[in-house]
Amino acid sequence: TDIEVVNQLQIIATNCGYGSTVLVRKPTIGTKDIFVVRIIKHQETYIKNVKKVDYEGIIWCPHTKNETIIARRNGKVFVTGNTPFTNITMDLIPSGQLAQQGVIIGGKIQKEKYKDFQKEMVMINKAFCEIMMEGDAQGRLFSYPIPTYNLTKDFDWDNPDYEPIWKMTAKYGIPYFSNFINSDMKPDDARSMCCRLRLDNRELRKRGGGLFGANPLTGSIGVVTINLPRIGYEAKNKRDYFKRLNKQMDLAKKSLQIKRKFLEKYMEKGLYPYSKFYLADIKKRFGEYYKNHFNTIGILGLNESLINFFKDEKKDITSKEGRKFGLEIMNHMRERLMTYQQKTNELFNLEATPGEGATYKFAKADKKRFGDDIISAADIGKHKGQDIAPYYTNSSQIAVGFTDDIFEALDQQDEFQCLYTGGTVQHVYIGEQLTSTEAVKNLVRKIAENYKLPYFSITPTFSVCPKHGYIAGEHFYCPKCDCEVGYKEGMEFNEV
């Protein structure tokens, strides 16, 4: 009946590697609540130390095999934690303005320049790749940080120092590749952030932001995503489509401007101390901390928008008529964003929104409002006739399962991918395991040299067994576990 005793019991249980929950029961006799502590076994969990802080409850400082957090909420002890979403650009050779800068050691600029440390760059990249290839304790890949490698016209494809990159790509498909081979941009012109946000630093240089390659001091204050399928469904003709699109874009612009004002106000109040420190020079020069940050507008479901607009499943983004109108829509958005930029003196860009939850939420809301009259991605292609939850395709992507030919998919997407000014990524799904690093390297090279798409990744197929970890290829059952129990491929089962 004593809450302090309950707290201590939960601490003891957690230190012993157990989870626990607390139920509160009203007494049948007396007035004190009765606390029932249930002990739950957690695998491979131990606590480094436990301490009480000035907070509503108890926070434990944990140490688990995969560096997650042990927390308690409403009496329940559970494993939690959210890995920071990080993207790092791994330069393989000292490049751009950074190569000519003196290195900083002990807080002081030295006479040696970054270009003098090629050997160390190779060592760091190799060590990074080896750690990423090991994965975690269960053989799962590390989701973050996402490494970006720049592919330029002078990229040395046969350099043996790059072999760890191709091995890492073949095993997990971890790296993203920034394609500058068929682009007028240079590596210093772009900064890759999160899973697809990619900012054009040339816009900042036009403003005279005093930026240099290693210190862009830029980002996006937020993304507003536009539901294109609803516009396509409601529009009576092309003129009406653009009228509705303009209205949604104006609302997005207004909301981002409101958010920008709030962020500036919160910054002044000291709510973002780290950002305030690093953006102090921007504030001195322009009077605003976030002057070099973009207002980002994204899109979802262009494919379904075209189908709903033409009232014809065949006129999707891959059809001649659908493709033409789809490109017209995106070019219209780019031009309108440029108009916003000129009128507001704020930076705007267009992003291929990852979607994730929004693809389902938009489709669910539209189905509730318009019923089965509006077409979602779940109603077409490989999903047709299946009872699955509604969703829309990400940004301007082709329908799921449209083709297994990666080059057909790239042919369809190349022109669309190049129209995003705020970032996009084309995931190249292999559908099988990759065993040859030479094949991986040749595939990346073929894509980079034959397409203009700015950002892409290679995604091989692999499986993870809770016991044996990483297994190349697709496996519904672990072959190593099967072998241990005596099962062989093709063996018949006897009914018991």
Locations of regions flagged by a protein language model:
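Generic structural "secondary-structure junction" signal
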Residues: 49-52, 71-72, 79-81, 87, ...
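Short, glycine-/Ser/Thr-/acidic-enriched flexible segments
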Residues: 2-4, 27, 42-44, 54-56, ...
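Conserved catalytic cores of very large enzyme subunits
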Residues: 83-291, 312, 318-495
